[in-house]
UniProtKB/Swiss-Prot annotation:
Gene3D superfamilies for this protein: NusB-like
Keyword RNA-binding: yes
GO BP, sorted A to Z: DNA-templated transcription termination; transcription antitermination
Protein name per the record: Transcription antitermination protein NusB
One cellular component term from this protein's GO annotations in UniProt: cytosol
Job of this protein: Involved in transcription antitermination. Required for transcription of ribosomal RNA (rRNA) genes. Binds specifically to the boxA antiterminator sequence of the ribosomal RNA (rrn) operons.
Highest classification ranks of the organism: Bacteria, Pseudomonadati, Chlorobiota, Chlorobiia, Chlorobiales
Gene Ontology molecular function: RNA binding
Keywords: RNA-binding, Transcription, Transcription antitermination, Transcription regulation
InterPro entries assigned: NusB-like_sf, NusB_fam, NusB_RsmB_TIM44
Pfam annotation, one family: NusB
Family, similarity comment: Belongs to the NusB family.
Length: 163
């Protein structure tokens, strides 16, 4: 069975980007991006709906974490793509209990490489997510079960130059 999670993450990123540029609701912005394969796969749609709802319902909390860890940046100055990759990854860390933190962070880094707003986007995303993850873990705010159980810190997910 094929998994569509990376594709779903990319579609949600595109929807979040659309929201930054024009007035619309997130469901409309994301819905037209989905492929028939995703629409017909109940597991894919479950993940899509969970991630989309988590971002929508918790955006203020997610943005507070980002703002607290981007000391020298006003939220409005962070590249739209990078900011929305961070939002998506934090929603996964906090609200998708079956996804390991290492996977959420690595997926965010890979998507940052693909949609990079600058040549340092993936490093920026990695650094911010690592700092936030460590804080959330220390505070006991990461709740995982099943495949999502925490087995080690993803602090060393990426230490090499992007390809």
């Amino acid at each position: 069975m094929k998994t569509y999670r990376r594709q779903i993450r990319e579609k949600i990123l595109q929807a979040l980007y659309t929201l930054e540029l024009r007035e619309t609701d997130i469901e409309s912005a994301a819905g037209w991006l989905l492929t028939p394969e995703i629409l017909e796969d109940p597991n894919a749609m479950k993940f899509f709906n969970l991630l989309l709802k988590s971002i929508k319902d918790n955006r203020e909390e997610i943005d507070r974490y980002i703002a607290a860890h981007t000391f020298n940046w006003d939220m409005s100055r962070i590249a739209i793509i990078d900011k929305n990759i961070l939002r998506m990854a934090l929603a996964e860390l906090l609200y998708c209990e079956d996804i390991p933190p290492k996977v959420s962070i690595n997926e965010a880094i890979e998507i940052a490489k693909k949609f990079n707003s600058t040549d340092k986007s993936s490093k920026f995303v990695n650094g911010i997510l690592d700092a936030i993850f460590n804080e959330l873990k220390t505070e006991g705010k990461i709740k995982k079960n099943g495949r999502g159980l925490i087995n080690h810190s993803p602090a060393k997910v990426q230490k090499t130059e992007p390809e």
